[in-house]
From Swiss-Prot:
Organism: Saccharomyces cerevisiae (strain ATCC 204508 / S288c) (Baker's yeast)
Gene this chain is encoded by: SMB1
Claim: Chaperone is one of the keywords in the record: no
Leftover remarks: Present with 861 molecules/cell in log phase SD medium.
Record's protein name: Small nuclear ribonucleoprotein-associated protein B
Record's compositionally biased regions (Polar residues): 140-181
Length: 196
């Protein structure tokens, strides 16, 4: 563990972006960058790694009568990468500062301001897009000759289901024409529908 100088009276609010080692009631240790906390001491750790001693290794930790105090223990600790993690405050025993943040407070403030400006810019652009109606571009005269016949073919469904079995395109054009009145259909109740 590296020794980091932190004020004795520092609180969790002062330790945001610091790398912390969190001990829990079940004996597990979580190491990660503190991102947020709340009044219940629920912690959000970024790039979190979980370390725990497996049950098979617990016997080596228990003191034995025949062993001497100077013996070294070969205990294998299991590590697991968790990523972004929320720890329940009810389970937390203590927190220890592992490492200082990568950026100083001033650099973090500058970074946060930049991120805030970018977010505001994106929301402003999104709102402007929603306000403006979609632009309809007029095709070039050179391209219009090639695309006009293709667009008509695409707009008209060729299935016999739509044109009633005959290949008369003119009969089906009113369906895609905005000037034609909308067709009204008789109400067909679904199966099991009862009128009151």
């Amino acid at each position: 563990m590296s020794k980091i100088q932190v004020a004795h009276s520092s609180r969790l609010a002062n330790l945001i972006d610091y790398k912390l080692r969190v001990l829990t009631q079940d004996g597990r240790v979580y190491i990660g960058q503190l991102m947020a906390f709340d009044k219940h001491m629920n912690l959000v750790l970024n790039e979190c790694i979980e370390e725990r001693v497996p049950k098979t290794q617990l016997d080596k930790l228990r003191p034995r009568k025949d062993s001497k105090d100077g013996t070294t223990l070969n205990i294998k600790v299991e590590k697991r990468v968790l990523g972004l993690t929320i720890l329940r405050g009810e389970q937390i025993l203590s927190t220890v500062v592992e490492d200082k943040p990568l950026l100083s407070k001033k650099e973090r403030l500058v970074r946060d301001k930049k991120e805030k400006k970018q977010a505001q810019k994106q929301t402003k652009l999104r709102k402007e897009k929603e306000k403006k109606p979609g632009k309809i571009a007029k095709p070039n005269t050179a391209n219009a000759k090639h695309t006009s016949s293709n667009s008509r073919e695409i707009a008209q469904p060729s299935s016999s289901r739509y044109n009633g079995g005959n290949d008369n395109i003119g009969a089906n054009r009113s369906r895609f024409n905005n000037e034609a009145p909308p067709q009204t259909r008789k109400f067909q109740p679904p199966p099991g529908f009862k009128r009151k």
